[in-house]
Swiss-Prot record:
The chain crosses the membrane at residues 1-21, 23-43, 51-71, 77-97, 120-140, 150-170. Its main location: membrane. Belongs to the YciB family. GO terms for cellular component: plasma membrane. Pfam families: IspA. It is found in: Cell inner membrane. This is Inner membrane-spanning protein YciB.
Length: 178
């Protein structure tokens, strides 16, 4: 259920764009939708994930520029910037602290060797880079409408495929441990 809630502003953006064909209007709706989403999360949990704060800041900054300047190119950069920041954070976690980000997130649930944790973390770094570059390619090589479709379905599809592949990789190491 949480994943659906996380995607709600993107879905709203998509629906408004499909109804109006106007990225400026869709972005103008995305901004308050994201603010409401983060506000609701804070009200419900009294905490906000860093990912949501980064996304909110970029939606307000790049979405605001899109609306104020009437230029949809600004909002098209958001997925690439988010993915770039995640790639930097995950890569940096390889060198800072005892555990990388993936191990911090999943280490209490899975007992894996350091090499596997490192491979998983670096795979995420690669995924974030590929996602960010692919977003830029689609955003600036294809029509706006194609990019809007890609933003919802393409990036989500890439993420699902990557998680499945990661699960297959993990299962082979979990079976070897038994």
């Amino acid at each position: 259920m949480k994943i659906l809630f996380d995607f709600l502003p993107i879905v709203i953006f998509f629906v408004v764009y499909k109804m109006t064909g106007n990225i400026i209007i869709a972005t103008a709706i995305l901004i308050p939708a994201t603010i409401i989403q983060v506000g609701f999360t804070w009200f419900k949990n009294r905490t906000i994930e860093k990912m949501h704060l980064v996304s909110l800041a970029l939606v307000v900054l790049l979405g605001g520029a899109t609306v104020l300047l009437g230029d949809g190119d600004f909002i098209k950069w958001k997925p690439t910037i988010v993915n770039g920041l995640f790639a930097i954070a995950f890569l940096g976690s390889q060198f800072i602290g005892d555990k990388n980000i993936i191990q911090r997130m999943m280490g209490d649930k899975l007992d894996l060797p350091f090499k596997v944790w490192r491979t998983l973390n670096l795979a995420w770094v690669g995924f974030f880079i590929v996602s960010g570059v692919t977003n830029l390619y689609v955003a600036f090589s294809y029509s706006e409408e194609i990019w809007v479709d890609f933003k919802l379905f393409g990036l989500l599809g890439m993420t699902i495929v990557f998680i499945i592949l990661q699960g297959i990789y993990l299962s082979s190491h979990l079976q070897n441990k038994e």
